[in-house]
């Protein structure tokens, strides 16, 4: 197959940052994606509907002329989040979800939840109203190995929360383990999972073998090969509970290439080329549209996009920049470690 026409995709987990970084990266998403769930972990974080409204205006102002893109706003859950504000923001159409960051789990998560019981009033209201909860599914206690954080989170936090609030709709974001895939499949009600582009391609060897490679370091960290294969199987399965959330997360190179580098991989610019490669490799190009364009909208109660894009397979590898320049500084682009032949020719 040399051409593939799919509905215009959406990204159900995206970091745009703010200021000069926002202005430097947004075009790589808005060029091909119609909508994206925008992560709220700014400094300071997006904790109220008013915060979300002003951040949304900054995003809209940064979208290049001619690009049609809708940012879908989220709130950063804290132990003091106001249930009334969440409900009002959701009912107004501004707020699409609330994000749970366990404190210390990832970039700018220090304001996150340390005691889930203290967030129960807002979680109970969300269950009543139908507001989705997006979770960064890792525990952060020092006694848990970093490669086990997701599995332990499922057992000690997610499963008890779902039993306590069975009506709460939960997105387990950036699933990285077979444990996560299996848990979603075994619990069909009010639970879904997003999968990143890079976790379909790299395992932990990419970070550690032959020297430490900071541009493959992300959180949740890439796991063993068995987990990568489980993610691939889930992504290509057509199962409506799994959909694309790139977790594209730009950091300037000096903050990655240092003694204590930031977690995050920038994939917005070449995600669709990478995904077409993966799905072709798995003999599943006919299911790429479900993963990128259909399953996510169905989960979030939105219609799929009417517009389409066309992917074409070239005879020669497709070029993409090794870095992009932003007002904040240079950002290294994800290198999948294989040539890419698929490119978007219409959007």
Curated annotation (Swiss-Prot):
<comment type="pathway">
    <text>Pyrimidine metabolism; UMP biosynthesis via de novo pathway; (S)-dihydroorotate from bicarbonate: step 3/3.</text>
</comment>
<comment type="subunit">
    <text>Homodimer.</text>
</comment>
<dbReference type="InterPro" id="IPR004721">
    <property type="entry name" value="DHOdimr"/>
</dbReference>
<feature type="binding site" description="via carbamate group">
    <location>
        <position position="99"/>
    </location>
    <ligand>
        <name>Zn(2+) 1</name>
    </ligand>
</feature>
<dbReference type="GO" id="GO:0008270">
    <property type="term" value="F:zinc ion binding"/>
</dbReference>
<comment type="function">
    <text>Catalyzes the reversible cyclization of carbamoyl aspartate to dihydroorotate.</text>
</comment>
<feature type="active site">
    <location>
        <position position="247"/>
    </location>
</feature>
<feature type="binding site">
    <location>
        <position position="251"/>
    </location>
    <ligand>
        <name>substrate</name>
    </ligand>
</feature>
<feature type="binding site">
    <location>
        <position position="174"/>
    </location>
    <ligand>
        <name>Zn(2+) 2</name>
    </ligand>
</feature>
<dbReference type="InterPro" id="IPR002195">
    <property type="entry name" value="Dihydroorotase_CS"/>
</dbReference>
<dbReference type="InterPro" id="IPR006680">
    <property type="entry name" value="Amidohydro-rel"/>
</dbReference>
<feature type="binding site">
    <location>
        <position position="247"/>
    </location>
    <ligand>
        <name>Zn(2+) 1</name>
    </ligand>
</feature>
<dbReference type="Pfam" id="PF01979">
    <property type="entry name" value="Amidohydro_1"/>
</dbReference>
<feature type="binding site">
    <location>
        <position position="15"/>
    </location>
    <ligand>
        <name>Zn(2+) 1</name>
    </ligand>
</feature>
<feature type="modified residue" description="N6-carboxylysine">
    <location>
        <position position="99"/>
    </location>
</feature>
<dbReference type="InterPro" id="IPR032466">
    <property type="entry name" value="Metal_Hydrolase"/>
</dbReference>
<keyword id="KW-0862">Zinc</keyword>
<feature type="binding site">
    <location>
        <position position="136"/>
    </location>
    <ligand>
        <name>substrate</name>
    </ligand>
</feature>
<dbReference type="GO" id="GO:0005829">
    <property type="term" value="C:cytosol"/>
</dbReference>
<dbReference type="GO" id="GO:0004151">
    <property type="term" value="F:dihydroorotase activity"/>
</dbReference>
<keyword id="KW-0479">Metal-binding</keyword>
<feature type="binding site">
    <location>
        <position position="263"/>
    </location>
    <ligand>
        <name>substrate</name>
    </ligand>
</feature>
<dbReference type="GO" id="GO:0006207">
    <property type="term" value="P:'de novo' pyrimidine nucleobase biosynthetic process"/>
</dbReference>
<keyword id="KW-0378">Hydrolase</keyword>
<feature type="binding site">
    <location>
        <position position="219"/>
    </location>
    <ligand>
        <name>substrate</name>
    </ligand>
</feature>
<feature type="binding site">
    <location>
        <position position="41"/>
    </location>
    <ligand>
        <name>substrate</name>
    </ligand>
</feature>
<feature type="binding site">
    <location>
        <position position="136"/>
    </location>
    <ligand>
        <name>Zn(2+) 2</name>
    </ligand>
</feature>
<protein>
    <recommendedName>
        <fullName>Dihydroorotase</fullName>
        <ecNumber>3.5.2.3</ecNumber>
    </recommendedName>
</protein>
<dbReference type="GO" id="GO:0044205">
    <property type="term" value="P:'de novo' UMP biosynthetic process"/>
</dbReference>
<comment type="similarity">
    <text>Belongs to the metallo-dependent hydrolases superfamily. DHOase family. Class II DHOase subfamily.</text>
</comment>
<feature type="binding site" description="via carbamate group">
    <location>
        <position position="99"/>
    </location>
    <ligand>
        <name>Zn(2+) 2</name>
    </ligand>
</feature>
<keyword id="KW-0665">Pyrimidine biosynthesis</keyword>
<feature type="binding site">
    <location>
        <position position="13"/>
    </location>
    <ligand>
        <name>Zn(2+) 1</name>
    </ligand>
</feature>
<feature type="binding site">
    <location>
        <begin position="15"/>
        <end position="17"/>
    </location>
    <ligand>
        <name>substrate</name>
    </ligand>
</feature>
